UniProtKB/Swiss-Prot annotation:
GO terms for cellular component: extracellular region. Keywords: Disulfide bond, Protease inhibitor, Secreted, Serine protease inhibitor, Signal. It holds the Pfam family Kunitz_BPTI. Residues 88-138 form the BPTI/Kunitz inhibitor domain. One of its GO terms (molecular function) is serine-type endopeptidase inhibitor activity. InterPro entries: Elafin-like_sf (IPR036645), Kunitz_BPTI (IPR002223), Kunitz_BPTI_sf (IPR036880), Prtase_inh_Kunz-CS (IPR020901), Serpin_venom_toxin (IPR051388), WAP_dom (IPR008197). It is found in: Secreted. The gene is Wfdc6b. Transmembrane segments: none annotated. Residues 1-35 form the signal peptide. The keyword Transcription does not apply. Disulfide bonds join 43-72, 51-76, 59-71, 65-80, 88-138, 97-121, 113-134. This is WAP four-disulfide core domain protein 6B.
Length: 148
């Protein structure tokens, strides 16, 4: 009698094929952002924020963002964010355009949300439609994280 051992079928590696093929195909894509579901970097999650109006989306998918930035639902619209930087520590940036849009930014030195005039284009994500949204994202988040 043969010794008691687990006899694996001859086709043991073929069972992995359905899992390996999609992985190989996604790995070979020239633009890695096209395989969005594979990557671990995730967008920040915020509690429901009450917005007076929905902002124009800067992006719809990660591949529409430059470099390593990710397309995230942030404040009141979708924006390209660099997940390695703290948005609330960015300086005030009105951008090069000449619109007159009252906005709010978080000043890390004073720990306050301060009103400024946004030009309507470019700038950075430390730019909120209201003081309430700025407070919700930058001040309340910091209070919660200081407890951890």
């Amino acid at each position: 009698m043969p010794p008691n051992r687990l006899l694996l079928p001859k086709m043991r590696l073929w069972g992995l094929l359905p899992f390996l093929v999609p992985f190989i195909l996604l790995w070979s894509i020239q633009e890695p952002a096209l395989a969005e579901g594979v990557f671990i970097r995730t967008c920040p999650k915020y509690n429901k924020i009450k917005c007076d109006f929905e902002e124009r989306n800067q992006c719809l998918r990660h591949r529409e963002c430059p470099g390593e930035e990710r397309c995230c639902l942030f404040a009141c619209g979708r924006k390209c964010l660099d997940l390695s930087e703290d948005i609330c520590s960015l300086p005030q940036d009105a951008g090069p355009c000449l619109a007159y849009l009252p906005r709010w930014w978080y000043n890390q030195d004073t720990k306050l949300c301060i009103e400024f005039i946004y030009g309507g284009c470019q700038g950075n994500p430390n730019n909120f439609e209201s003081k309430a949204v700025c407070t919700s994202i930058c001040i309340n988040k910091r209070k919660m994280s200081s407890w951890i």
